[in-house]
């Protein structure tokens, strides 16, 4: 039996939507993208949603909307993918990486509080695996640090504190204390990449909570300008009779979503509650099967939060990195693809060049060295889930 790690769940519904988009004669940003934005905003309970070509672009556009740039500092986790950190570098701000708490995938919140200076302009928490982080703690931290905050644009002044900019790449559909992620932090970015629960092949979106004194429609238009060359009309608006004239308001960027991508998303959204439920069924089976094994797993469903069930993260108790890698190889030999989430950011060459060293992030390294991620996707049959369970137990026992 061969078990893929995370293939997309594409049905005739998605295929038909894409075909209709292709036949429509409009394949770039247009009515389907706008409809997906409306439906996502309704689903999440946010004023607006801006669909873009990736979560990375969404996060960078959020930082730019907030006016963050050279001379500013942005805090995020050392335990994540590069896309949580690289947008900070893109805008020219100083990247401040925080170690995880012991035996946790979340940042050490005491270290977050200690890292805040009068230059801190955003904190980017990461919902690893689809599990919402401790947003209440984060808001307490930024409210306690109000006296240090020096705002530099209208949005910052309206907030009056350090903005929480959530990396929700994994957590589309998750809830924190009854609220959807995307509607908890000040700003949020989501990924719709091919491996995500909800996909548009490539893609992502930005959302925000209403900020008193800030017009949501004007903010939406600012995102549109930033993501389409600074052009004050999109291609669809320019096709209207006599409406060719346009202006370039700034030398900005190109990261819009196309209607072909949005067509996939519209179909996915119709099915999404069922996809989330299937992920929970698989997680429950894994949890039950591994409860007596020498492993630690992430709690996806608690009284406080409901995960999106994106990744099934397993730590092998007391294992070395070499033993973890051996387990990955043995499972691959038996046809089960696994992965590791994540190699901490300071271990990568690009960040070493920026002066980071994994020696300064011992807890993040301890999380990484014995972590393995098992297949978790909605194409898995019950038989395949049973095979993953059997194979994992067998290979774990042989270490």
Language-model features: where?
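N-terminal "arm"/small-domain region of PLP-dependent enzymes with the aminotransferase-like
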Residues: 1-26, 31, 247-249, 375
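Amphipathic, non-transmembrane alpha-helical secondary structure
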Residues: 16, 60, 109-117, 136, ...
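Phosphate-binding glycine-rich loop
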Residues: 26-73, 87-89, 97, 146-150
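PLP-dependent aminotransferase class I/II
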Residues: 34-38, 46-47, 122-126, 131, ...
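PLP-dependent aminotransferase-like
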Residues: 64-168, 175
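Hydrophobic/aromatic ligand-binding patch that stacks against planar heteroaromatic rings
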Residues: 86-88, 180, 260
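Conserved active-site segment immediately N-terminal to the catalytic lysine
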Residues: 152-199, 244-248, 297
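Active-site PLP attachment segment
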Residues: 170, 183-233, 259
């Amino acid at each position: 039996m061969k078990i893929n790690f995370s293939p997309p769940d594409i049905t005739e519904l998605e295929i038909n939507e894409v075909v209709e988009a292709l036949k429509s004669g409009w394949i770039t940003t247009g009515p389907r993208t706008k409809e997906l934005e409306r439906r996502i905003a309704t689903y999440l309970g946010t004023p607006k949603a801006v669909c873009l070509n990736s979560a990375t672009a969404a996060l960078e556009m959020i930082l730019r909307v907030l006016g963050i740039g050279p001379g500013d500092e942005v805090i995020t986790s050392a335990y994540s993918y590069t896309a949580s950190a690289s947008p900070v570098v893109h805008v020219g701000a100083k990247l401040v990486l925080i170690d995880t708490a012991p035996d946790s995938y979340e940042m050490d919140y005491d270290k977050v509080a200690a890292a805040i200076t009068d230059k801190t302009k955003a904190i980017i928490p990461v919902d690893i695996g689809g599990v919402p982080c401790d947003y209440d703690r984060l808001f307490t931290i930024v409210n306690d640090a109000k006296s240090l905050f020096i705002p530099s644009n209208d949005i910052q002044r309206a907030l009056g504190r350090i903005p929480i900019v959530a990396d929700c790449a994994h957590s589309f559909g998750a809830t924190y204390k009854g609220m959807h992620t995307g509607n908890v932090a000040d700003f949020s970015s989501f990924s719709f990449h091919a491996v995500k629960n909800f996909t548009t092949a490539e893609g992502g979106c930005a959302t925000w909570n209403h900020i008193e004194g800030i017009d949501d429609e004007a903010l939406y238009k600012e995102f549109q300008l930033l993501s389409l060359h600074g052009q004050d009309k999109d291609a669809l608006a320019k096709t209207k009779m006599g409406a060719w004239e346009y202006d370039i308001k700034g030398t900005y960027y190109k990261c819009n979503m196309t209607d072909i991508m949005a067509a996939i998303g519209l179909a996915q959204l119709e099915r999404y509650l069922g996809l989330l439920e299937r992920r929970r069924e698989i997680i429950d089976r894994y949890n039950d099967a591994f409860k007596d094994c020498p492993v630690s797993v992430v709690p996806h469903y608690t009284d406080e939060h409901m995960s999106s069930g994106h990744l099934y993260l397993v730590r092998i108790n007391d294992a070395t990195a070499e033993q973890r890698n051996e387990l990955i190889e043995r499972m691959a030999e038996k046809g089960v693809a696994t992965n590791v989430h994540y190699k901490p950011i300071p271990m990568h060459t690009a960040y070493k060049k920026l002066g980071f060293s994994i020696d300064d992030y011992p807890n993040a390294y301890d999380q990484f060295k014995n972590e393995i991620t098992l297949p978790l996707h909605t194409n898995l049959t019950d038989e395949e889930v049973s095979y993953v369970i059997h194979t994992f137990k067998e290979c774990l026992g042989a270490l």
